[in-house]
């Protein structure tokens, strides 16, 4: 049997990838499932299944149809998970399915362990372990809590990356807007008022006549936005120009100027 050290080293290999490449939650679930011989789920705070793994023969039809098909746990059950503020080991379902009240469980002697995923003093999700026939040992719980720490670090990293990306996109839009002259800014406001959503067809001459500016002002404004990577434009000849917004912060920043 593998020692605790051997099992921890397997998990460490995943942790060592963090920062170089994104950690896939399914990878953590797979390794933990292999070393503990149990079903493993990584669940977000809102109940979404971020990763899971089942050993052979440990998949029941209810889980497959209700959980895996939607990749989400029922809200009522997820609320129970979130109410666990520390590790709750070896919870028995007493032969009753926890997802279908009163229905007998397909698998006998099921025990569940709930491990909260916490990072930066915030509840980020839950690591759920389900075993059949054998209770989790203290060694298993150590590995479970260690894995929850790895997952928590990765969720925090993903959140930080998302915040940084949002700030970058916002800064790019602000710089692009800053390069426009007053007349070009006026033209841009009318252009995106004409668009239906994130993309659409623009006839520059119609907007020029409507606003009372030259067509060249519109063309220059679009070129500046395109060179900044904020939009993508494609000429369709006499039909006009097809415009697609690439940066989802553009419309929000234009609204602030009005």
Curated annotation (Swiss-Prot):
DNA-binding global transcriptional regulator which is involved in the adaptive response to starvation and acts by directly or indirectly controlling the expression of numerous genes in response to nutrient availability. During rapid exponential growth, CodY is highly active and represses genes whose products allow adaptation to nutrient depletion. Belongs to the CodY family. NCBIfam families: codY_Gpos (TIGR02787), PRK04158.1 (NF003170). The gene is codY. This is Global transcriptional regulator CodY. The keyword Nucleotide-binding does not apply. Pfam families: CodY, HTH_CodY. Its main location: cytoplasm. GO terms for biological process: negative regulation of DNA-templated transcription. Keywords: Cytoplasm, DNA-binding, Repressor, Transcription, Transcription regulation. Residues 204-223 bind DNA. It comes from Clostridium kluyveri (strain ATCC 8527 / DSM 555 / NBRC 12016 / NCIMB 10680 / K1).
